[in-house]
Amino acid sequence: KVVCIIGRYVDQHSLEVVSMGSYPSSGLKKGVVVNIDATTDAIQKSLDQAQASFEGKIKNVYVGIAGNHIRSLNSHGIVGIKDKEVEASDIDRVIEAAQAVAIPSDQRVLHVLPQEYVIDNQDSIREPLGMSGVRLESHVHLVTCANNAIQNIEKCVKRCGIGVDGFVLEQLASSYSVLSEDEKELGVCLVDIGGGTTDIAVFNSGSISFTGVIPIAG
């Protein structure tokens, strides 16, 4: 099925769900589009349901993505700290260095999720901005997805007259709503059993360390 949720910002870090719509779809199988017309129809009907009880017009959406095409790996990068004090540009450079890995031509990077930073062998740093040192390292979790899977979903959404602001890995989106910061810090495995796939995310020491997709579901 296709589910549309409309939320309103309560504050900078939380949303209030104000409306929801859902509609079964035969156009999706194991998280990917197998029929453009059927998927477009289900998206439109779920949007109509959600907007029926919402005062306003939805113009853009974030789309959850899953499927057996999802890949992930842990990577790291190292750069020199230009002025001996970490600036935002240094963080950008070390993240870019971490994601400079070879991926298949039919895949694209979906998320670059920082796990920790290291400054001159001092590890477990969450926010390096402003700290002193000469060498900055980043450890990140990279998530990639198939180009055609993204393109097909985006095509279906745009056929409904809606723009796409971005794509979010479904288990990552679920983690924001069901896991506390304490749980992520202590270590937790999230298992999201959907209609087409079972999505897994493992958190430890406050950051994500593993994501996976099993093409079997409820």
List where the protein language model places each region:
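Conserved A3 ("GATE") glycine/threonine-rich loop of ANL adenylate-forming enzymes
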Residues: K1, S174, G196
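Short beta-strand scaffold segments in enzyme catalytic cores
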Residues: V2-G7, T198-V202
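Nucleotide/phosphate-binding catalytic cleft detector across ATP-hydrolyzing
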Residues: I5-L190, S207-T211
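Glycine-rich phosphate-binding loop of actin/hexokinase-like ATP-binding domains
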Residues: L186-G218
